[in-house]
Amino acid sequence: MENSGKANKKDTHDGPPKEIKLPTSEALLDYQCQIKEDAVEQFMFQIKTLRKKNQKYHERNSRLKEEQIWHIRHLLKELSEEKAEGLPVVTREDVEEAMKEKWKFERDQEKNLRDMRMQISNAEKLFLEKLSEKEYWEEYKNVGSERHAKLITSLQNDINTVKENAEKMSEHYKITLEDTRKKIIKETLLQLDQKKEWATQNAVKLIDKGSYLEIWENDWLKKEVAIHRKEVEELKNAIHELEAENLVLIDQLSNCRLVDLKIPRRLYLTQAAGLEVPPEEMSLELPETHIEEKSELQPTEVESRDLMSSSDESTILHLSHENSIEDLQYVKIDKEENSGTEFGDTDMKYLLYEDEKDFKDYVNLGPLGVKLMSVESKKMPIHFQEKEIPVKLYKDVRSPESHITYKMMKSFL
């Protein structure tokens, strides 16, 4: 055992130095070689133990033979002595049985030795086989592994190239399939069109004269309908242009007539056209009305003329501001503040009512400034209006009857 341990230590010291890092294939080979070496060492150790046992058995057999001879001699002496003493004599059969037992024991020992020798021979054969395998793997590690690694890399490159070629071929086949499908579809459509034309030609050949004339007339009517539709569209466009020009001309004429009549713009917008005055003009002219209403505290003669002039202006403002409820509330607040202004407001509203009735007569009389010079003032009773009246006036101004129409414009001309 000590010799085997020393031999293993020498093998470990005498072996080549280990590398720091090895590839997987070489590491596997080293691992397998180590396993084989360990197995060989175990077998060698078993062989040595068996040899030692064999030597021990040989020594024991020799010792047993010597003991056997000694016992035989001793038995013979005892027999001789027993015979001499008159003891029972050992017969030959007893001796033979004893000898047979010893022979059987020796035979068993010999069989055991043979078995041990057979095991030793088998172990030696295995040891030789393992040594041959070890040499083979060492040669493969030194020479064949590099060659196989090169083969593996070349095969991997071949596989990659085959995959790339397969992908390119598949893409090419897809493109060719799409092109062929498109070509087939185009050819089928062309063939269908040709067959339709041939069918129509054959049908026309077989058609009677009456039906042929009907078909020809139908085509002619379709063409005429298309031409008629184009003409209708052109006429509609021309009509729209003429209507726009007419509206422009009517607007110009109305503006010219209004300038000739000298009617204020807000009066026309509120009474004739039924429109609303923008809030900017309202806010600009409201303070003027308050100033004029404050100037009513004067003598009676001047008061009458001022009232009429202020009545015309207030009619314009009242009609222009009737669309908003806030102006009505503002007028009511002024009534509560000044009792003298209530008389002027009632007269102004009465005159407004009269102007609405006789609007056409005022227009036919001529300029509005000359008409106002002939107005005389009169004292009238005060009529307090209810709160619902301005709402009714607001509704009346916005009614469809108050809007301007073609007949109204014709009356101005």
Swiss-Prot record:
Recorded hits in InterPro entries, A to Z, give: CCDC83
Record the organism.
Answer: Homo sapiens
Q: Which segments of the protein form a coiled coil according to its record? A: 37-184, 216-256
Protein name according to UniProt: Coiled-coil domain-containing protein 83
Record's keyword terms, sorted: Coiled coil
Compositionally biased tracts (Basic and acidic residues): 8-21
The signal peptide stretch is none
Region listing for Disordered, in residue ranges: 1-21
Q: What is the lineage of its organism?
A: Eukaryota, Metazoa, Chordata, Craniata, Vertebrata
